[in-house]
Amino acid sequence: MEHDLERGPPGPRRPPRGPPLSSSLGLALLLLLLALLFWLYIVMSDWTGGALLVLYSFALMLIIIILIIFIFRRDLLCPLGALCILLLMITLLLIALWNLHGQALFLGIVLFIFGCLLVLGIWIYLLEMLWRLGATIWQLLAFFLAFFLDLILLIIALYLQQNWWTLLVDLLWLLLFLAILIWMYYHGQRHSDEHHHDDSLPHPQQATDDSGHESDSNSNEGRHHLLVSGAGDGPPLCSQNLGAPGGGPDNGPQDPDNTDDNGPQDPDNTDDNGPHDPLPQDPDNTDDNGPQDPDNTDDNGPHDPLPHSPSDSAGNDGGPPQLTEEVENKGGDQGPPLMTDGGGGHSHDSGHGGGDPHLPTLLLGSSGSGGDDDDPHGPVQLSYYD
């Protein structure tokens, strides 16, 4: 059963209506017994009674129905009891109109019409209540036709003025109200059980709040996932280097030793394509155009008299070799020297040779930002490509 979202949380369950007190129940049973005795006396006293006898008998039957409702289902006194009381008042009005004349008769007729309209309204309200309790359209149609059939039979009883017909009509009215009572007893009890069952379920507002907390927790988890998965400062720790295959040419600015590694390489892995001194070479057959070492010689020539350690492209002589394969230069100074056997590339110690170009190469290089490569705290990028 759907709840209104604007309604607050369900309150405590209302205790069921208890049975009537023993004194009131005994009094109702006594009145019911007296009403039955009076009704039987009126019906069986004169089998050829007139219209007033029919109305008296019908009025007593309505009182009997009201007492039955009070004894068994007091909660139905409002719709069914009000209908019976209104019918009883109309019956008494008809008994009074039977001997009236003139303006009193006219006023009585107006009141009679007004009472009939009230009876019709209460009957429609009763059918609507049955519909809300789960009655089908065929059950409502059966109650509606039975009600109007009893009215027609009552009019026929007033016309015939026979007590046996009056007895039959009164019993039909009693049967109609008993059928409504029995139907409402079973279906109303089931409806009450379903209502209590629905109240025990969580309220939609509470479910909305729970879903809101759940969505907040999900969003917090998503936010935590973003923090953990590394959308922070710097490049990702593991990435794929999509540089030139095989360690292609380095077209950046020349190294501090005024050499470029793009030309044909000498045995010492240097290029002699830089500008040469127009003067003849020194006796040591070396070129003094580049930055000179402490021995006043340049390592760019083919006949370096002294053994020389592999120089760092950044100007650092000697030192332990850097475990790097290839650095992607993006506009800054070239990184540490390359000590790889990259296929098709060049290196300081391996010359034109190299490993198999089809094998994958593990790259251990800088972040590619072109910054200072001597920073020990800079992020390291692991690259892997074929």
UniProtKB/Swiss-Prot annotation:
Coiled coil: none
Protein name as it appears in the record: Latent membrane protein 1
Highest taxon of the lineage: Viruses
Domain notes: Two regions, C-terminal-activating region 1 (CTAR1) and CTAR2, have been identified within the cytoplasmic carboxy terminal domain that activates NF-kappa-B.
Comp. bias regions, Basic and acidic residues: 210-224
Biased composition (Low complexity): 251-267
InterPro entries: Herpes_LMP1
Region annotated CTAR1, chain positions: 194-232
Annotated stretches, region: Disordered: 194-386
